[in-house]
Amino acid sequence: MAGPTRTKKSRTKPLKRPESRTSELAGATALVTGGSRGLGRAIAEALAKEGCRVIIAGRDEQALDVVSATISRAGGSAYVRHCDVRNEKSVDALASAIHKQFGRLDILVNNAGIAHVTATVDQLSTEAWREVLDTNLTGMFLVTRAMLPMMHSGATIINNLSISAKTVFPGMAAYNASKHGALGLTDTLREELRPRGIRVISLVPGATDTEIWQQFWPDAPREKMMSPASIATVVIAALKMPGSATVSELEITPTGGSL
């Protein structure tokens, strides 16, 4: 269960202003859940480079502090917030803190996610099933619902679904189900929020050199995988599209083909 929550700016003093202060995204307020490592970290750093005020949220506060310090050294603005997306009170506290400090949210990146050691359905524990679904699907729902009152026309939601939203990996029933469910939630949000001028984008990356891939496929050829930074570059490009247009889905695969 989540511990005490707090909002803070990195203790590291910025050394310089971001080079991209003229970016279309400069001054936007962005929240990245699961921002302490992997793809979440890469997206948070890319947003900060564009001049966004980035809130990075997650359970590993020490790791979040490292990301915040890295962003600050590069001249960006990062704010750390402890949050367990499975816990409704923790999510509501996060929303309250963002509203109090910034008053609005322009970009929401739902990136928090976990996976468990592979197990066939007949060997999968109820506890493991619930933990994955609660994090990857219910967590996305709780965060989005809590943040929507602060999001207005021109805002964007990006949900990281992973390639498991489009295919299945045997032995990963909970993860597959959570991502397929997240795809359905994302598609629903897109239609519900279209009249409000809020864009909703599905992020569907293939093999990316992140902790989850390293954990479950340690022998996979890393040289054929995409880097988190390359995915973040595509995300930034989508965010910079004119408000009158949107990319509904970003399905990104390695140039070298399947592993």
Residue ranges: model-predicted function:
Residues 119-121, 125-130:
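Substrate-binding pocket helix/loop in short-chain dehydrogenase/reductase
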Residues 162:
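Residue(s) in the substrate-gating loop at a strand-loop-helix junction
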Residues 29, 36-37:
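Conserved glycine-rich cofactor-binding loop
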Residues 50-67:
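Conserved glycine-rich Rossmann-like NAD(P)H-binding loop of the short-chain dehydrogenase/reductase
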Residues 202-203, 218-259:
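C-terminal helical subdomain
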Residues 144, 178:
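Active-site helix of classical SDR
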Residues 61-62, 82-94, 126:
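The beta1-alpha1 cofactor-binding region of Rossmann-like NAD(H)/NADP(H)-dependent oxidoreductases
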